[in-house]
């Protein structure tokens, strides 16, 4: 089996291409989920202040037999804290029982309030202080990203967006790549695979490779150059989602999955959300 792949970010830092998402997991659930994830080989964990499970993540990491240097921990600045990123980060660090965060992401731009440039400037300072290794954003559209770059001169290393076979965001993905911004997929299985896992192309590829539909979709993200963070608290599913290193999809197969794109957003519209 091939080793899990890593991605080099534009700031020189390296992150695993496949991580564990913990959205909607309780503090108790997240402890057992992370224990299982580390056991099967995950080294990247993606949480957020808004998930209200950073304390559980912290306990799991505290008890882990994996060295801190081997782990890649992401958390996120919530919308209410755009004017106080320092306090928000220190609160997250305390809950996570960590000295630094590998990747700190602004969770939403919230253009109705329009503090995202101010928040970004604060995140830049926190990175300079060594409290954060890398800084990025989630759910930013091209015009939000361009404004950050124009007003601060600092480009996010990551843009984590809703991305799955029904919502492929190819224009944004390409724009990110042109600006050396790594695209990361949230809700990569389209919230449990509804409308995706039953597609003929997905089922046919699952049969061909002896894999599950979820594994095919995760491999599609990986082979499309995306960082991907499938969420699960089920031990068997956590293991299944990581068992994707012994096959690859070819160009034609990726192209067939590309045809599933409907521009179908399952989550909020970033131009409207918050505020």
Swiss-Prot record:
The active site is at 51 (proton donor). GO terms for biological process: L-ascorbic acid biosynthetic process; methylglyoxal catabolic process. GO terms for cellular component: cytosol. InterPro entries: AKR, AKR5C2, Aldo/ket_reductase_CS, NADP_OxRdtase_dom, NADP_OxRdtase_dom_sf. It comes from the Bacteria. PROSITE patterns: ALDOKETO_REDUCTASE_1, ALDOKETO_REDUCTASE_2, ALDOKETO_REDUCTASE_3. One of its GO terms (molecular function) is aldose reductase (NADPH) activity. Optimum pH is 7.5. Disruption phenotype: The deletion mutant is not susceptible to glyoxal. Belongs to the aldo/keto reductase family. Aldo-keto reductase that significantly contributes to cellular methylglyoxal detoxification by catalyzing the NADPH-dependent conversion of methylglyoxal to acetol. It also exhibits fairly high activity with glyoxal. Shows broad specificity and can use aromatic aldehydes such as 4-nitrobenzaldehyde, 3-nitrobenzaldehyde and benzaldehyde, and phenylglyoxal. Shows beta-keto ester reductase activity toward ethyl acetoacetate and a variety of 2-substituted derivatives. PANTHER family: 2,5-DIKETO-D-GLUCONIC ACID REDUCTASE (PTHR43827), NADP-DEPENDENT OXIDOREDUCTASE DOMAIN-CONTAINING PROTEIN (PTHR43827:SF3). This is Methylglyoxal reductase DkgA. It comes from Escherichia coli (strain K12). The lineage of its organism: Bacteria, Pseudomonadati, Pseudomonadota, Gammaproteobacteria, Enterobacterales.
């Amino acid at each position: 089996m091939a080793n899990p792949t890593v991605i080099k970010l534009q700031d020189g830092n390296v992150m695993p291409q496949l991580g564990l998402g913990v959205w909607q997991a309780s503090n108790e659930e997240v402890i057992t989920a992370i224990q299982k994830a580390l056991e099967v080989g995950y080294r990247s964990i993606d949480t957020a202040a808004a998930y209200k499970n950073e304390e559980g993540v912290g306990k799991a990491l505290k008890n882990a037999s994996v060295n801190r240097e081997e782990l890649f921990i992401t958390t996120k600045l919530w919308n209410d804290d755009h004017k106080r990123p320092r306090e928000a980060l220190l609160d997250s660090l305390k809950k996570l029982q960590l000295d630094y965060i590998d990747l700190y992401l602004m969770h939403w731009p919230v253009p109705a309030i329009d503090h995202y440039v101010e928040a970004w400037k604060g995140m830049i300072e926190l990175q300079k202080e060594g409290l954060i290794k890398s800084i990025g954003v989630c759910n930013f559209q091209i015009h939000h990203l361009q404004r950050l770059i124009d007003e601060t001169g600092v480009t996010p290393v990551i843009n984590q967006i809703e991305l799955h076979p029904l919502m492929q965001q190819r224009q944004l993905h390409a724009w990110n790549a042109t600006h050396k911004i790594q695209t990361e997929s949230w809700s990569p299985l389209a919230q449990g695979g509804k409308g995706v896992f039953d597609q003929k192309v997905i089922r046919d590829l699952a049969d061909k490779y002896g894999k599950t539909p979820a594994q095919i979709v995760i491999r599609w993200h990986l082979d499309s150059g995306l960082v991907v963070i499938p969420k699960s608290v089920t031990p068997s599913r956590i293991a299944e989602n990581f068992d994707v290193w012994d096959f690859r999809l070819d160009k034609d197969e990726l192209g067939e999955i590309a045809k599933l794109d409907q521009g179908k957003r399952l989550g909020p519209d970033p131009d409207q959300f918050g505020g």
